[in-house]
């Protein structure tokens, strides 16, 4: 009988060795799978014993030239289905693969389903029912460029789901991948040596390690396998097999230690260990991996699935973690072996360790790599006691500028009650970032590097920027958000991650605003508009104020605090309007004439008839809008936009027009044609923290001529 064992990319060689050790004959290895020959009892032993396979399928038949509906139907119809189930049982069909004729996997699955139903109708005048969730038998078909392979699901649900893990942390590791790390680490060569995971999360690596060291077949305590529903299954033989495997379990002296800083996740690890009946073997402790200390007097092996940065803005924490891990390992883990899993090569380099070997894997959809290190005397001697060792000595120029800029803003910040401000704006060309402070937190925004700058050099400089920002500004790494521009699939973009939902309140000129530094590209407050908002507050008394493209309504808050008699806040985003209402609540603002309207601002202008005495217009540089035949571009379309706004600007009203397009040129002729006049106030709207970047925005006061 032929079977195929499925696994994840990178684990195939380990699976081949495992199958061979179990007595199976391996006939073919491909990406993500291994084909082997075995009798039914040996195949059942594989299902019970495998640490590396995720699923085992039994081959029914494979045939070349099956490439359309008719040939697929005939191929499925010709199989002796009564050998595997009867007309009173249920079945399901999984189909994988497409071609020019079979373009839809669901349709192809239905073709096979129809063939099976017709087969039983002809043979028994009775048909089995389909049960997609809990079928007695699951048929699996795989289409490739040569033809179709037909299988019966032999193992059932994922073999990697051992049953002990009901709780997990962020970025969990799959059990079969954890087993692969343990095997590759070399720890199994001497299971009496300590095994330590400083970022243990839900404890998966340690629980897998204990099971492997005890020679425990992971499927022994599984509730059931798909093969138990097949006619060929012999319960007595299977019982004997399980008793044999139970007898193979040993009880070595194990020294397993797991640390994690997250008490909640650590609680899940403890619960998982209890379910695996290993809670008396594995010792868990809440501890910060950035402050490593010795965990054993004898050297052992460190195996850890390091954090990947699964949350946007967590890069600062990752840089801090890896730099401190490197120092901690060298100080307290001499003669230990390290096996560390991660995604980012540049972060591994922060360990300042010479890699012994590297293995590439997949953790779900993520490309990850396992790096092996040997902490011998030579490795340890490479370090210094300075945990903030920089990639470049020249990075201290950034640190000095950061410190100087902050000191220079100190009096101005205090006088104006400002707690959110820019402290660095690409002052030094090599350090092409902006750094904004928000209370006890910060945002580092990386600008696109020139093409001639090597990407790895930029990464290293950014790492230094992160460390020095934390050090010089005395901000905890977990409170530093980093917005990094990276190339992905040919496009340069900022990639959002899972949201943290962390908000805080900042102040300016007596106003309070809610900001979110981690979940979006922008924070909820455009710092460069600060003086425009103050102008609005100072000139809003008893006026009708309109805020277009309002974002989180911060200008509207200032208008309200300035005594505006009516305020209309318009934005397309429901999220941002709700945010704006939160800002009103923060400032105890309540008035029936203060309205929020969700709308496309260009579309809204088409129907607007009310008059406004003070208007703030801050359109995007570029946008798609149903109001425009083509996409909106502020340079080419600003006169058209001002034409619409003019209609609702009261005779003595003032329009504050601003945009962020570099090199923007006002169409003065077009403006005169509209009967409007404009005064450029760009320089006057730059507060001290933005004086270093005079091109941050363009702004005008526009009135009727």
Swiss-Prot record:
Keywords: Cytoplasm, Methyltransferase, RNA-binding, rRNA processing, S-adenosyl-L-methionine, Transferase
SUPFAM superfamilies assigned: S-adenosyl-L-methionine-dependent methyltransferases
Cellular component aspect of the GO annotation: cytoplasm
Highest taxon listed in the record's lineage: Bacteria
GO molecular function: 23S rRNA (guanine(2445)-N(2))-methyltransferase activity; RNA binding; rRNA (guanine-N7-)-methyltransferase activity
Role: Specifically methylates the guanine in position 2445 (m2G2445) and the guanine in position 2069 (m7G2069) of 23S rRNA.
HAMAP family: 23SrRNA_methyltr_KL (MF_01858)
Protein name (record): Ribosomal RNA large subunit methyltransferase K/L
The species this protein was found in: Pseudoalteromonas translucida (strain TAC 125)
